[in-house]
Every structure is written in C-alpha cells, then in structure tokens.
Amino acid sequence: MSGKIIFFEDRDFQGRSFECVGDCSEIASHLSQCSSCRVESGTFMVYDQPNFKGLQYLLTRGEYPDYQSSIGFNDCIQSCRIVPVHKGPFKVRIYERPNFEGQMHEVTDDCNSIQDNYHMSSMQSCNVMDGYWLMFEQPNYEGRMFYLKPGEYRNLREITSNDMKFNSIRRIRES
C-alpha cells in the first residue's frame, strides 16, 4: 500500500500543509482546517468526521483546489484512509435483505442500477469476496457513497445512516 496526499489549510494549496502517506484518523491534530488537497499517488477515501466516519468520498490522483465545491463536503476533511491496489478479480455477493437473506446475486463488474439489473429494490447486506468497492445511494453511481473492503456486511443500514439505500456499486480500480 503506497500513496501520498497533501492537505492544505487554505484553498488553492495555500497555507500550512500536512503530508500523509497512509491512514490518518484525525487530520485536525495536524491542521486547523483543510480546504484543498493534492493526491500525488494512490487512491484515498476521505471522510467529513474523524475516525473514518461520516460522509465519504473517493479521491484519485489529481488536484482538488477547492474540494468543498468539487466533492460536495460542507465541512472539512477530518480523516482519510488509503485504498489498497487490487490486481486480481473482483467479486461481491449482494443480498436484498439483512443477514444475507432474500435474493442473492454475485457481482463481478460495475452495476449502475441494482434495481434494473437484478430486480432488487435495494441491497441491504453483502459479502465482499475480492477487491474494493464503492456502493452508491442512487443509480448511475450518484449520491452518497460507502467504501467496502473484503469482508461480511450483515446489515448495511447499521454501518451507514438508517435511511440510506444502495442502488449502484462500482469496483475501485487503479487510477
């Protein structure tokens, strides 16, 4: 796992900076605020709350001179996590209901509409077997997103906000 992201207190890469090469649970311990950032290598999930909580957004290599307008965070980035590079196959089993119940479908590619492709109103549990994925609240990879790493997710509503439904899913591939 290698990556590098630089956070800046002010817009347009101005003010004090903090260079991060891995996970950081509390950016506020390094900067008073974060208003812009530059991803020099790797892929990062950023969060609007400390300890990898709250709204999430995927940042790939590039510059974000005013990330609040480009990614839609109303507040500062408070924590970040590096997304490992996955070179093998991708596989996730999605379930219609919590605890791996109801319809089940094995997904190995991006799916822009769970309802249209699998006739499920939403995905409420899943088992990520291979790769790293992003689930989205709305079809076509829009709305709030949530990062999934390999493992079992018995009830997606317990680890996100209770009103959140997931309607599309996409693989995180090397940028």
Placement of each model-derived feature along the sequence:
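Compact beta-sheet-dominated domain cores in extracellular/mature segments
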Residues: 1-175
